[in-house]
Amino acid sequence: KQAPARVQELEEWGAVFDRTSEGLISQRNFGGHRYPRLAHVGDRTGLEIIRTLQDFCVHQGIATHMECTGLDLVLDGNKVSGLVGYWRETGRFILFKTKAIILATGGGGKAWKVTSNSWEYTGDGLGMAYRAGAELIDMEFTQFHPTGMVSPPSVRGILVTEGVRGDGGILLNSEGERFMFNYIPEKFANETADTEAEAQRWLDGDREARRPPELLTRDVVARAIKTEVEAGRGSPNGGAFLDIASRRPADFIKKKLPSMYHQFKELAVIDITKEPMEVGPTLHYFMGGIRVDSDSQQTNIPGLFACGECAGGMHGANRLGGNSLSDLLVFGKLAGGGAKQYVNNLTNTINCNDVDVSRILTNATDILNRDEGKNPYLVHEELQDIMQNNVGIVRTAEELQIGLGKLDSLKADIENVYAHASPQYNPGWNEALDLKNLIITAEAVTRAAILREESRGAHTRIDFEGEREEGLSYNIIIKKTDSSMTAEKISREDPPQELVDIAHASLKELEGE
C-alpha cells in the first residue's frame, strides 16, 4: 500500500524513472507477477535508487561513514546502547554511542560459492543481532535466482536481471528446446501460457493471453534449469541459454537492457544483441532474517530495528521479482519512524557497557596477535563448499545433516583463524572477522531447513515433496541459548481477514475487485 508513495518520494528527490509515451512511469513485468508493476530505470533501478538516496543524504548533511564496518552491538542490560566498528583503511576502532540502531545490512549470500551477492554480503547484521539475543525467522527460505552468469568462472554467479525475460527473453537447452513449457506447476497452469503463440501474444500486450513460463516464480525456473543440466541438456558451462537476440531488435535491447549489454560485452565478450547468454541458478536473496514487528520493525531487543533483506518475514517463502526494492523503501521508512518513537519514549539514560566493548575489541584483535592459525580464505572456501553442496536448491535430510556436522567442525577453525599483525589495509583480517557472521548465517539456514519437512516456496526437500497443510501454521525461529543455537517451530497468529480472503480468492474474483 505504501510503495507508490515511496516511488513518488524518490522522484521528488531526483530519481528519473522510465516513462511511457503518455508520460506515466513505465512499469515492467517480472517473474511471478500477473501484471506489469515494476517502476524501473532501464535495467539499473537499484543504482538509480542508491544515487538518489546518496545525493539526498549529502544535501541533508547526514553523516556517512564509508568503509566503516560494524563488529558487534553493545547493550545496556537488555537495551541497545551502541555499536563497535572499525575502519578498513586504518584498522582503527570506533564506538558509536546511540539509543537506537537500524540494521539494513542485507543477507549472507557469500556463504555459498555461486552467488549474485557482492563481497559485503556476509550476514553481518544477522550475526550481530543473533549474538545480542535477537531472534531470526524463516531462515530456510533462501532464493536462488535462475539467471546468473556461468562463464567465465571469475564472474560465475553475477546477476542477469529478470528484465531480460520480462522483455521477451526465452530459455533454451542445448537441443534448442524452449524447455520451460515442460515445467509449469499445476497451481500456475491457469495463468501460464502453454504455447509459444500465446506467450508471444502476452508479450505483444494481449490482456487475454497468459504470461510466458519463463516468468514463473524464481524457484520454479531455477529448479527447471538445474533439472535440464542434470539430464545432460545443459549449456557447455553447466547452465542454460537465455536468448533475447532472436526476439528483439538490437536497438531495443541496448535501450531497455543497457547494463546487461555492457556486462556481457565486458565480462564474457558476448554481444547479447547477436547471441544467447549462458545462465544458471545463483544464490540471490534471503527471505528469512531478523524477526521484527511488522509496523515498527523493532526486534525483541529494545532499541534494535531491522529492515530490508536482513529482516525476515516480509516475503514469506518466496519473494517476487522486484519486491526487494519496494520492501527496503517502505520498511526502511517504517523502521526510521519506529526508532524515532522509541527514542522519544525513553526515560532512562543509556550507557555503553565497558566490559562488552573490551570483549568485542579483544575478540577482533586476537586474530592479529596469533603467531599461527588457519587461513581465513581457505576456511571461507570450505564453508562455501558445504553450503553449495549440502544446502542448495534442492535438499534432503541426509545432506543437510552432513552439512550441519561439517559446519560444526568448521567452528573450531574459525575460532583459530590467523591474519598478519598489521590492521591497516588487511583484507585477511576483514575476511576472518566476516567468518564469525557467516558461520552463524550458514548454521541458521541449515537448522531451519532440517526442521521444515516439506517443500514450500524457495525451500525444496526432495525427501518431502509438496506442501503440507501444517506448514502454513508455523514459522521457524532461530534462537541463541547459552552458547548453542536452537531452531523451533512457533505457531503463527491468525492473519487479518482481508488477507485470508485474498489468499482464497480466484484470479477472476481478484481482477473483478
Where are these regions (language model features)?
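An anion/pyrophosphate-binding glycine-rich loop and adjacent beta-alpha core
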Residues: E135-E266, G338-N344, H380, D385
